[in-house]
């Protein structure tokens, strides 16, 4: 391949530009042999496609909560509960993952199934206003804290087409350091994950309200200054939630299921938990869990979620406690960023897999979040059980026998 002048690199997504990029790169076959027309609006300089194999694991036996937001505060309210059996799609190339998740789901099903809960729903854009002095930054913070209701009304009354009516401002929190006033705009975004709509609305607030109405004139407005928890783990949102859905999953495994399905014992699982928790603390790990990102990334890839959000979404806190007749296992995902409308969920492949779980479209995002949490706990249970065997032989054998199969 001969390098092409960067200025001459075709950047459009029309047929001619796509073919020009493919020809210049010498690409053909599998990566270019599919119809790319559904993806022309998905990204810039579209050139080909990457196919990821998808397994379907299940059924997961889950008691799911039914939820809605109250108004005007946007608190998550449980309106009912129902049990369902769900098949979960996993897009990945990690040998052993699907089999392990299935084993965890089976152990849970034989013990009464999973139970899941949604505690909170927020997504944040953390702007920053750079002032001349600390005094001005404090004045600005006091002004913003006193005008939350006015800002909500101002945003709701805007009629510009680019401002979203679905991204609703719920809270405003300020953090002053030096001459900077960081402002955390907290939104709910309906069934969309919502990063684009809340970014537009945060920009409108910054430039149309704060810069125009504040008693001090900031020198600079920055739309995102890294306090928002976007696409990276952070202690703030691990501990308190607030960037994504805060979701819990639990199951009480019987001694029989642990012994017969997981091939280990409660004692061995608790020994692993003790050692693993100390290891997590010693390493400074943000999460207290085993392998949550594997399940979350696989579901995200199958269902058109933003893969950049796996980092935040896979922050996890797992627990295990001996109870009469078995062990109680719990998992908290404080920042699960998912959507069932918009973005990549509109692609045919994503729609198909979301529909398989009855999670496509409006009114489905809390169901989807709970299914992700249950599937993640299923993998945590099985992977932990394999590591808890003597010498972690089961974990070794799974990777030796299944992890190396690529052809």
Residue spans for each PLM region:
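Glycine-rich anion/phosphate-binding loop at the beta-strand->alpha-helix junction
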Residues: 188-346
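Short glycine-rich or small-residue beta-strand-to-loop segments that form or flank ligand, phosphate
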Residues: 43, 57-61, 89, 126-132, ...
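N-terminal loops that bind phosphate or other acidic moieties
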Residues: 136, 150-183, 199-203, 207, ...
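Extended hydrophobic packing segments that form well-structured cores
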Residues: 8, 361-407
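Acidic/polar, glycine-rich intrinsically disordered N-terminal extensions of enzymes
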Residues: 1-87, 100-102, 120, 398-407
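Small-residue-rich
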Residues: 48-179, 183-186
